[in-house]
């Protein structure tokens, strides 16, 4: 980082924060938000003044599920390229997942990732420790202050981290006093679906991306999620279900109590909110994700749950693969794709089309990830908090184009789509790291610190 962080005065921006939208000035100094007021006059001529008239000023987005592919899969992406894509999209903090090579299933391997991020990350960072069938002692040693969460793959996905021993899963729920998170799909159901479809189609080579939601079906998701949620209720564990993809699963989650009082929580991802099975004909493997993108009814149910409180956070599951890998035949193409650079504009566009208040998007992408994970002094525009902010121009449409993407994979399922709002400028810890389409200064990310309160 720079030896000293510049002082910025953002004038006349419209703040979208804590359920309100209002015009104010914001003073950033020493990497923190020093003051928020109706009108602030510069104290001296060293203050850099940013004119925010007509623009929205939001807390930096906290993306609580990303896969940045380092170590071991760095031809797809790495901590530098993908965190740069993050800040270009207004994402100032992220929680990265353990399915790298090697998988981050020990604290030693996890600390190596922290050390690398400290050198190169443009955004603030933390990492989840991966659970296996046999590493419960390591999981128990993970600090709730320094490690984001314990990640369980209850259904197979990229990497080799499947936790398929019921006794091991139950021990984790009962004995590990940490935030538990999970990818929930029932492996036997998916295997049976795959075998049946291969037989029906006359061979695996005849399967297409449109078969993905038939293999990774509603039944597979609900069986796994419902078992895990029942176990969490029985044991009293703090449990968060990643990328809920079906309307049926939403019935597992409580909308009646405040997030701060919930122990069982749910995430929806941008791609499940945007796309449906009707898009496979056009996009094919580009929208092959695990869990699968499902029906229009599922997508619409997830959208409704953004408003009623059953969905607590929105994340990306940003998971880059090369376009060459995605263009293989369906059964050989990996699942996942890059989304992080366009996630905030996409969600603001969705809000605009569905008449959802932008303040609700800020809650789901900024405030509530901070509350759920207990991230200290981030996720809100508050005096004294770290100066992680994003300035958005709501009246400057842009069309997603591959050459403008910073992800190493250089493609997006959103290519060709036009969004009404674009990210103009991003601050991380008080430093401008992105402005008008280009990275600025140098990586400024810091390690996230957690205060769970339990």
Question: Which sequence ranges carry the predicted segments?
Answer:
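Divalent metal-coordination and catalytic microenvironments
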Residues: 13, 31, 54, 65, ...
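Short catalytic-loop micro-motif centered on adjacent basic/acidic residues
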Residues: 95-96, 126-129, 238-243
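Histidine/acidic residue-rich metal-binding segments in metalloenzymes
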Residues: 137-314
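A glycine-rich helix N-cap at a beta->alpha junction
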Residues: 115-131
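Metal-associated gating/positioning segment near the N- to mid-region
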Residues: 55-120
